[in-house]
Amino acid sequence: MSHFKAVNGFKIAMFLFCCGLQEVVVVIQSQRNSYHARRSEQRKEEILQQAAEEGKGCPVVVLLHELTEYEGDWSILPALPHLFATYGQLASWFIFVEEETRLRLAALLRVLHRYPEHEEWFLGRGLHDDGASIIHHYAFSEDPSSFTYPDPSAGWAVSKPLLKRLAVRLQHESLKSDFTIDLHHEIALYVWEEGNGPKLTAVPEFCSQMRDNCATSFTTFLPDCGEPVPKTDVFVAVKTCHKFHHDRVPVVRATWEKDAGFLEFYSDVSDSSIPTISLGVPNTERGHCGKTFAIMRRFLSGAVPRADWLLIVDDDTLVSLSRLRMLLRCYDSREAVSLGERYGYGLLHKGYSYTTGGGGMVLSRVAVSRLMSSGCSCHSDDAPDDMVIGRCFTSLGVPITHSPLFHQARPDDYSGKLISSQQAISFHKHWNVDPLAVYKHWLKDDLPRDEL
């Protein structure tokens, strides 16, 4: 019997044994990386312990990364048919939470009892765009507040009838886009089905911060795992080209470069005034795969100081290195780690995940070594580097680890309610913004330089 069948068999047995909360399935959106697997297991134990103390039975708690062997289950939609087939006969509600989301089960039951379980319901804390957003393909740009999507940190819920309809649709339809970019906005669009399905119902008890009546709340986006890793543990590679030497590069130097232990600018030409390093790869208008693979080869060589971590960014990426070093303390550099903002391609049909390049790609030395020794390579210099790397890691069984603190776009492209509660690590693009002001407002930590 496989591990996954054994786990699912145990969960079903527990479901049948309990009462009271037995109609609730809690899905923790867990990840395969060892740190996140431990955190989600701790959250599961907390939920079950709380249920035992309250004496109202216990819910089923599913760790999403254990549901099946498919890594793409993180994007939720591919997992819904399996979730319904496994638990649909027993459950009335499916609650989706982050590993740092806390539940108050008694309050949650009171909330769910307000909504007839035989109807289609999509519940959560509503977010909406503050303006036209590129990451949402400018959907509802004429009235951004007219469409709401769930705040993932507060959790969200679907009733059994809605889950059933979604599961059936997913087995017979293709998605309009092959890309998974902003997961919860895309889920809300799929549920809404251009007016044929329900919109999100705002539930005040689904909270990002704890209040007296909250059924859910969120602990932290930036966990405290101890002292930040040393500056010298992170090697920073900035991709640039000649036409941006006097435009974008000065922004990097005026903002976050001073917080780096080791940093190099890689360009198509050498410029001693910066300085930049030419890797012998011609500049391309897009993709940059050839340049990125050359950076990784250089990182493993003796040409640069040895470091446990490699951060690859664009020259128009803004970064908080102090927060990144805090986050990296949570991860084991002896493992193959690929960390950043996770996107997906073709995930409904066994596609692959990747760390989007604009927000910054963080790779452990072990991950870089495995990638470069695997034979994976670019089919052209202008191939999309982040997607090629993601496809390679998928073939190697290296999970892509997501952090919502990395951002492929500008602050204006995200819901203000969401990013105002974060301690962001990165934003991307200088278009229509003052990058110095963005860095100062969103990323700069007011600490003495020797404490960063």
Which positions does each model-derived feature cover?
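Secretory-pathway lumenal glyco-enzymes, predominantly type II signal-anchor Golgi glycosyltransferases
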Residues: 1-452
